[in-house]
Amino acid sequence: MGEINALSCVGQDDVVSLRIVCTMARDGKQHNLEDVDMYGNTALLKACYLGRFECARTLLEFGANIFAMNYFGQNALTLATYAGHLTLVKELLRRRSYKDFNLSSMIPALCVATLQKHSALVAYFTQLDSRGVQETQTVHGLGVAELRGMIKAAGRLDKRNVRSPPTFISNRLR
């Protein structure tokens, strides 16, 4: 059996053990809530990515770093948005502003919600910052309208399910 730490507790959705680990970390006993996995995710980031609300809330109660970012430039809000977890998104926004989260991420939460087709989150983020929707862009300069266009184009291609003509390598007669 592997080492028990905050990351493994989140991975197993074990809130009871996580609470024990958090208590030990707070008391300075051999545990660190900010340890990272191979992607640079802290336990809080992993909980957000997996949509584990109780784990995330426990970590936040014990002072997990809400400003953490993984190696891909994703923060807690973008990962909770990716998971499509509105309740978790609201919990995070009680502790840090929407604008501040978006300024620290390569892809703003609204763009993530748009790409993942999480309409409830798109509506929620639009309501939070209705004037900023037109200005919201990824670091690549793609706005919400462009992302929606890309999704529609991809959907049309999927419906056609266009196959490329057989080539020498893919020819079944070979």
UniProtKB/Swiss-Prot annotation:
The keyword Signal does not apply. The gene is plu. SUPFAM superfamilies: Ankyrin repeat. SMART domains: ANK. PANTHER family: ANKYRIN REPEAT AND KH DOMAIN-CONTAINING 1 (PTHR23206:SF8), MASK PROTEIN (PTHR23206). This is DNA replication inhibitor plutonium. Keywords: ANK repeat, DNA replication, Phosphoprotein, Repeat. The keyword Chloroplast does not apply. One of its GO terms (cellular component) is serine/threonine protein kinase complex.
